[in-house]
Amino acid sequence: MNELNKENSIITYIFELGLIKSIDEVKEFMRENSSPYVFNCDEPKTIRFEWFLSEDEKSATLIEMFEDSDAAKLRLENHSASHLVEEFPEHFEIKQFIVLGDIKSDMKEKLADWNADLRGNVAGFFKGID
């Protein structure tokens, strides 16, 4: 994938979130609940799952990256079947959900209820990290 303007299968989720609970509760949810749960899911093509907090600690960003559309779909399915489906909205308000990459039509159907902003790949490169 180390070529300029070559299509790739990588899908990225970017969640922009407002915090509902206290900063301590949110950090605990990120570190002790959400991250360990996803880390231990059987999702071999999930390649990134990282939380970020704004400097004022009033908003958060969650970035998830997958090798392909099928892996991104599996993450949504696992989320929907987990305890996180109820706990996530207790901690965060989704301000924006952006999906980057070329997703399959079955994935578009899954994302319809999420009000996702779908953005297909146009140009650039992905060198990856060794």
Q: Could you tell me what each predicted segment is?
A:
Residues 1-60, 67-78, 90-130:
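Short S/T/G/P-rich N-terminal loop/turn motif that feeds into the first structured element of a domain
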Residues 80-86:
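A short, acidic, amphipathic alpha-helical segment used as a generic capping/interface helix at domain edges
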